[in-house]
C-alpha cells in the first residue's frame, strides 16, 4: 500500500526591491556579485572539505549562479515588452546542511531570483523570503539555515544598492 500524499500549506513572502541602476547595469552588477558556480572544481575537489574551500573562494558573497534565463529574448515578438532575467542563485554547501535532514528542501534551493524593469522603467529584484520557505519543513535545523539565507540575501540586496527589508520582523512567530 502506498503512503498518502502530503500537502503542506505555508506563508510565502515575495520581496520586490528597487535597485538604483538601470536594468543592464543592475544585471551586470548582480552577475558580478553572484558568480557562476564552477561545478567542475567542486566535483573534482576530492573531499567535502575541499569542496567547502573551493566554494568559499567561488562565492565571496555567499551565493553562486546555477542558471540564468533571458526572459526578454524568449518572449520576443509577443505583446510583452518587459526586460527580465531570471536566475537560480544559491550555495550547495549551505543547501547540503538542510538536505541532510530532508532532501525535499531542494525544491527551494537554489533560490529563484528575477531582475526586471517595471512599467515605469525602474529596475527591480524579485525574490521570495528564504526563511519562510524553509520553515515550512517543520524542522528547526532547516529553519535555522533559512534564517542564515535571509541574512545573506539582505547583504546582497545592500551590495546591489537596494534597501534590504528587515526580514527578521517579517518571520511569523
Language model regions located:
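Short beta-strand scaffold segments in enzyme catalytic cores
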Residues: 113-115
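Cytosolic covalent-transfer regions centered on His/Cys nucleophiles
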Residues: 1-108, 117-173
Amino acid at each position: 500500500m502506498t503512503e498518502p500524499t502530503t500537502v503542506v500549506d505555508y506563508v510565502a513572502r515575495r520581496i520586490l526591491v528597487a535597485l538604483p541602476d538601470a536594468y543592464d547595469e543592475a544585471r551586470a552588477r548582480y552577475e558580478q556579485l553572484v558568480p557562476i558556480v564552477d561545478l567542475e572544481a567542486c566535483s573534482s575537489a576530492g573531499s567535502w572539505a575541499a569542496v567547502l574551500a573551493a566554494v568559499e573562494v567561488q562565492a565571496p558573497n555567499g551565493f553562486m549562479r546555477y542558471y540564468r534565463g533571458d526572459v526578454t529574448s524568449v518572449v520576443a515578438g509577443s505583446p510583452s515588452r518587459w526586460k527580465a532575467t531570471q536566475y537560480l542563485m544559491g550555495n550547495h554547501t549551505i543547501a547540503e546542511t538542510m538536505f541532510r535532514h530532508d532532501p525535499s528542501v531542494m525544491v527551494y534551493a537554489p533560490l529563484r531570483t528575477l531582475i526586471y524593469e517595471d512599467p515605469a522603467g525602474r529596475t527591480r529584484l524579485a525574490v521570495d523570503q528564504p526563511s519562510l520557505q524553509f520553515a515550512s519543513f517543520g524542522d528547526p535545523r532547516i529553519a535555522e539555515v533559512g534564517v542564515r539565507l535571509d541574512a545573506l540575501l539582505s547583504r546582497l540586496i545592500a551590495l546591489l544598492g537596494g534597501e534590504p527589508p528587515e526580514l527578521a520582523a517579517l518571520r511569523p512567530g
